[in-house]
Each structure stands twice: as structure tokens, then as C-alpha cells.
């Protein structure tokens, strides 16, 4: 994609190395082929970061906010990306990491993973995010003893981007917009934690807003 190509260029321009490996989170075959390539060409991952998002549900009109109006196929897509997809990525990547005895498996999540809430107009369909959090908890219990640091990272706010800056709230409350660099620092902090003091859930919230619970 254009975003991946731009990121690849930026990394290489700074003297780094990177590859773009596309996969479809709704396809087990696609995920397996992607990790087969990674393991064959680049070796066992040191870290796997799941950061897949989706827009499903944002265009539902205000008079159709109730669950009864939500198409089943919309729910299926959200479930694929938020729960089934991460499950398949874990299956494809963790066996080799377990045998290696080290690594981190970090999941980007949001506040909807903490408790069920009524969906507001313009929001994506976030019900399956609860299952993503549960997956992180299960993997923590199963793989910590094998040297794999699993963490669920709750990004509790709007991340700075051209699209986010165009929103009215960004003009009224710029202090509520989250820095991507600061979020990346938090992920790196998790990845480099000493194994005697692992954090398994981290919530990132702008100072000017109340944390979601």
C-alpha cells in the first residue's frame, strides 16, 4: 500500500532496513504464508506488534445505532480483525518464538476492550476488542514461562494524524491528541523490560482526559 511504501522509504532514508510483507487478517492461508516468508528470509521475530484497525460501523447513521440494525457481515469483519486475526497471527508466530525462548508479542487495543459500551455515531464496531484483550491474557498465562512477553496496550484516545487533526475536537482540545512517537516509546519500553518485572497491560491516556474504565 501507499502508506507501507512511504514508511519503507522513510526507514531506509534513515539508514535502517525493512521489508513490507502483506497479509490478509481474514485469511489463515495469507497469514501463514506471510510468516513462512518471514521465518525463512529474516528468521524468528524478536517482537510481533499487532496494530490492525478497521472502520466498520463508522458510517452507520444516527437513527440506526442499535444492535438490531448492524449487519451480520459488518460484525464478522470486525471480529476477524479484532479477535480471529490476532489468534491466527499468534498461532503462526509464537511456536518459533517459544522455541527460541524470548521475544515480545504486543497487541494494540482501545478502551472498548475494558467493558461493553453503547456504540456512538461515527464509532467503529468495537465489541470484539474484548476478545482481543482476553487473548492477550490467555497468551500471557501460556507463554510467559517460555520467555515470551505478552502485553495488551490500551490506546485511550485519538492518535495524531492528518485525519485526526481535521476533527473539530483537535482544534478545541489539541492537548487530547496523542503523540505517535510517545506511543512508540511505550511499546519499546515494554519490549525492553527486564523479565523480572514485566507489564502485561498498559493504558495510555492523554493527561487532560479521564482514563476509561
Where are these regions (language model features)?
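Amphipathic alpha-helical dimer-interface segment in Rossmann-like NAD(P)H-dependent oxidoreductases
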Residues: 36, 77-99
Amino acid at each position: 500500500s501507499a502508506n507501507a511504501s512511504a514508511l519503507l522509504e522513510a526507514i531506509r532514508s534513515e539508514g535502517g532496513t525493512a521489508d513490507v510483507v502483506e497479509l490478509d487478517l481474514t485469511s489463515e492461508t495469507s497469514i501463514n504464508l506471510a510468516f513462512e516468508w518471514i521465518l525463512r528470509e529474516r528468521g524468528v521475530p524478536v517482537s510481533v506488534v499487532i496494530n490492525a484497525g478497521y472502520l466498520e460501523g463508522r458510517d452507520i447513521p444516527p437513527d440506526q445505532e442499535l444492535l438490531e440494525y448492524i449487519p451480520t457481515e459488518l460484525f464478522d469483519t470486525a471480529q476477524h480483525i479484532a479477535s480471529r486475526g490476532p489468534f491466527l497471527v499468534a498461532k503462526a508466530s509464537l511456536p518459533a518464538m517459544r522455541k527460541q525462548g524470548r521475544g515480545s508479542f504486543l497487541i494494540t487495543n482501545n478502551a472498548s476492550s475494558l467493558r461493553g459500551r453503547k456504540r456512538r455515531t461515527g464509532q467503529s464496531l468495537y465489541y470484539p476488542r474484548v476478545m482481543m484483550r482476553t487473548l492477550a491474557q490467555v497468551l500471557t498465562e501460556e507463554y510467559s514461562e517460555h520467555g515470551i512477553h505478552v502485553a495488551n496496550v490500551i490506546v485511550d484516545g485519538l492518535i495524531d494524524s492528518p485525519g485526526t487533526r481535521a476533527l473539530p475536537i483537535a482544534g478545541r482540545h489539541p492537548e487530547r491528541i496523542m503523540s505517535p512517537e510517545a506511543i512508540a516509546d511505550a511499546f519499546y519500553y515494554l519490549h525492553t523490560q527486564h523479565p523480572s518485572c514485566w507489564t502485561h497491560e498498559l493504558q495510555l491516556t492523554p493527561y487532560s482526559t479521564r482514563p476509561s474504565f
